[in-house]
From Swiss-Prot:
GO BP terms in the entry: cell surface receptor signaling pathway
Protein name: Wall-associated receptor kinase-like 8
Glycosites: N32, N39, N147, N171
Keyword terms, alphabetized: ATP-binding, Disulfide bond, Glycoprotein, Kinase, Membrane, Nucleotide-binding, Phosphoprotein, Serine/threonine-protein kinase, Signal, Transferase, Transmembrane, Transmembrane helix
Catalytic activity field: L-seryl-[protein] + ATP = O-phospho-L-seryl-[protein] + ADP + H(+); L-threonyl-[protein] + ATP = O-phospho-L-threonyl-[protein] + ADP + H(+)
Record-level Gene Ontology MF annotations: ATP binding; calcium ion binding; polysaccharide binding; protein serine kinase activity; protein serine/threonine kinase activity
Superkingdom of origin organism: Eukaryota
Gene Ontology CC: membrane
SMART domains, A to Z: S_TKc (SM00220)
Length: 720
């Protein structure tokens, strides 16, 4: 058993010695002084022999022993030295540590009764106990304390109970099972140490051991606690301090000690190695002698005092020049390609602008001399930024004419951006005329067009944004936030009639919408109706009575007479409005496969109910109870007149508006504005004098679709 203990101590000493036994070329001791005692290097301020140490506290006595390995003694503290910390020459490490033997404190150990003292007193010396040491207790039933001048500053307990033994790592580390370790509180710089051991349970016998050591007893350094009662010594790490303020130089770095005045701990600066306590003891490290000491790689290493530098060789310089030139060439080509791509994009935008009638728009707006609102022309970049590059998440709706996106302009204004699908070149002139005409319309119930963009392949229109969905959604997908009462429906019908009447008769050039339906009636934040989507709307010369165009519109709303004759008149919009009135009355969709084939169209379904006096049966259940029956009957009769197969028997939009306005005014207890003769102001839409409108008369073309008759519109064109 004693042999095993000796082997353990030898292993610990060899580990400490090997850590700092690397061969060094710098002087450790003063000139003509021995720097070794056996295999242990002895650095200054320690020394062997008179005149070789700083003062008496650092005197080393090299004493021969029977096992042929000399013992290093510090006579002033009566302790044996095991090794010195020579520091790391390649980092600023403080060069002020050494290691001594210290006896263990035993209690209740029959084999070690003669070794019961573990006290250490360093008062008056330049030495103090390093905070790297750990207070250690070994044995069963042990309660140990570290004492400093009568005060217990650290303690721990050990037991052999099964509850701790089952803990993972209990047999290979000091966690309380037969062994425990505690760190010393930092910054104390203790010079006095003693240990006290007690029994946890007085009635139980056992051997208790306590000591101070710089080793952490775990892993490969773990010693079974049973062996520690046979141990005599362990090693303690000590540090020293000296008044060396005069030593600081470019090669030596000394830092003051917080607790001891005029006390310093020194080290060599980075790039130097040696003993900082010897004048001239820090010498330059030649980093170029070993590739591992520098980072020059293939470059030439040149040693300088305290450091090194890397110089490029001619091949390296040539390689670097070629690499830099290649990078500059690549960067230049990238800039050239970027500029060329930018030039192509700008050229393409100019091409689209001219092809889409941009020059014509500029020419026509110049004729107006600022007498009317000019059409704002947006750049493609403006609208890309406004719509986040036409992100799919910004889509408000899609239809036969194109896709509508929600956007925000630079000034914070929210707009609706309509990206059309296609436009024929022969219709561009008429398209520009329509933009100018529609941009001058200013009516509270008409969605205002704010401008356009002609730099894209297909022109883009910008409208005011209407936030509160369309009438179709409110009728067929109702929400509790906005109930569609009869009063609201009558108000919406009156507002839509007002807008269409304005377009038909209150402007100098009548405009036919040609696609009146509930999805094209938007509701703003105040639930005011706004007529939108003029994608297929057309203006007509004041002396003309109709347009002759390709048949377009939405099934369920299209005038049957228009389908047969290709002639679109203001009465065709009246027919579509009549279907809209029925939609408001019944809450039914304009086309439904759930109805019989002959009444799938809402108009036919309504007329059949009127003939059979079943109007009350088809009314929307949401308005049956609260509506005024006389008002409902009056609106139903007005809708029947609007659906007359002979357009001459239909009322004009002006007549429809007067009738609805009278009903609404009567409901509010006021006199109708229309009855009082307060007509719409006749708005003069300015057009260039050189422009007149005429229309071609193509054959009927109807799309093969069960729900839509959307086709490309025939635009009015300039006469020669």
């Amino acid at each position: 058993m004693g042999v095993d203990v000796k082997r353990f101590l030898v292993v610990m000493l060899l580990l400490r010695i090997c850590e700092y036994a690397a061969a060094s070329t710098f002087p450790l001791a003063l000139r003509n002084c021995s720097d070794h005692c056996g295999n242990v290097s002895v650095p200054y301020p320690f020394g062997i022999g008179k005149g070789c140490y700083k003062n008496k506290w650092f005197e080393i006595v090299c004493k021969s022993s029977s096992d042929q390995q000399p013992i290093l003694l510090l006579p002033r503290i009566r302790r044996a030295v095991t090794s010195f910390n020579l520091g790391d020459p390649f980092s600023i490490s403080v060069y002020n540590k050494f290691y001594i033997q210290s006896p263990l404190k035993h209690s209740g150990c029959p084999n070690r009764d003669g070794y019961s003292s573990s006290s250490l007193n360093l008062k008056g010396s330049p030495f103090f106990i390093s905070e790297n040491n750990k207070f250690t207790a070994v044995g069963c039933n042990n309660k140990a304390f570290m004492n400093v001048t009568g005060l217990q500053i650290v303690g721990c307990e050990t037991t052999c109970g099964n509850e701790i033994r089952s803990y993972k790592g209990a047999n290979t580390s000091c966690v309380g099972y037969k062994c425990c370790q505690m760190t010393i509180p930092p910054l104390l710089q203790l010079q006095v140490f003693d240990a006290t051991v007690e029994k946890l349970e007085p009635n139980k016998q056992g051997c208790q051991v306590a000591f101070l050591t710089q080793f952490t007893l775990s892993g490969s350094l773990f010693t079974p606690p049973e062996l520690m009662e046979y141990s005599e010594y362990t090693t303690i790490e000590l540090e020293w301090r000296l008044d060396l303020s005069y030593m600081t130089s470019k090669r030596v770095l000394c830092k003051g000690n917080t607790f001891f005045e005029d006390s310093y701990q020194c080290s060599c600066h980075n790039g130097y190695e040696g003993n900082p306590y010897i004048p001239g003891g820090c010498q330059d490290i030649d980093e170029c002698r070993d590739p591992h000491l520098n980072k020059c790689g293939k470059r030439k290493c040149v040693n300088v005092l305290g450091s090194y530098r890397c110089e490029k060789t001619w091949p390296a310089i040539l390689s670097g020049t070629l690499s830099s030139g290649l990078l500059l060439l690549i960067f230049g080509m990238w800039l050239l390609c970027k500029a060329n791509r930018k030039r192509k994009v700008a050229k393409q935008k100019r091409k689209f602008f001219q092809r889409n009638g941009g020059l014509l728009l500029q020419q026509q707006t110049s004729f107006l001399h600022g007498s009317v609102n000019r059409t704002k022309v947006f750049s493609s970049n403006d609208l890309e930024n406004a719509t986040d590059r036409f992100n799919a998440s910004r889509i408000l709706g899609q239809g036969g004419q194109g896709t509508v996106y929600k956007g925000m302009l630079e000034d914070g204004m929210i707009v609706a951006v309509k990206k059309s699908k296609a436009l024929k070149e022969e219709n561009l002139e008429e398209f520009i005329n329509e933009i100018i005409l529609l941009s001058q319309i200013n009516h509270r119930n008409v969605v205002k067009i704010l401008g356009c963009c002609l730099e894209t392949e297909v022109p883009i229109l910008v409208y005011e944004f209407i936030p509160n969905r369309n009438l179709f959604d409110h009728l067929h997908n109702p929400s509790e936030d906005f109930p569609m009462s009869w009063e609201v429906r009558l108000c919406i019908a009156c507002e839509v009639a007002d807008a269409l009447s304005y377009l038909h008769s209150a402007v100098s050039i009548p405009i036919y919408h040609r696609d009146v339906k509930s999805t094209n009636i938007l509701l703003d934040e105040k639930h005011r109706a706004k007529v939108s989507d003029f994608g297929i709307s057309r203006s007509v010369a004041i002396d003309d009575t109709h347009l002759t165009t390709i048949v377009q519109g939405t099934i369920g709303y299209v005038d049957p007479e228009y389908l047969q004759s290709n002639h679109f008149t203001g009465k065709s919009d009246v027919y579509s409005f009549g279907v809209l009135l029925i939609e408001l009355l019944t809450g039914e969709k304009p086309v439904s496969l759930l109805r019989r084939q002959e009444v799938r169209m809402l108009g036919a379904y309504f007329l059949e109910a009127m003939r059979n006096d079943r109007l009350h049966e088809i009314l929307d259940a949401r308005i049956k109870e609260e509506c005024d029956r006389e008002e409902v009957l009056a609106v139903a009769k007005l809708a029947r007149r609007c659906l007359s197969l002979n357009s001459e028997h239909r009322p004009t939009m002006r007549d429809v508006f007067i009738e609805l306005d009278r009903m609404q005014s009567k409901r509010k207890g006021t006199q109708s504005q229309a009855q009082n003769g307060e007509e719409h102001a006749h708005i003069q839409i300015a057009m260039p004098e050189s422009m007149s409108l005429s229309y071609s008369s193509p054959n009927i073309v109807v799309e093969n679709s069960s729900f839509s008759l959307d086709t490309k519109p025939l635009m009015p064109h300039k006469t020669q």
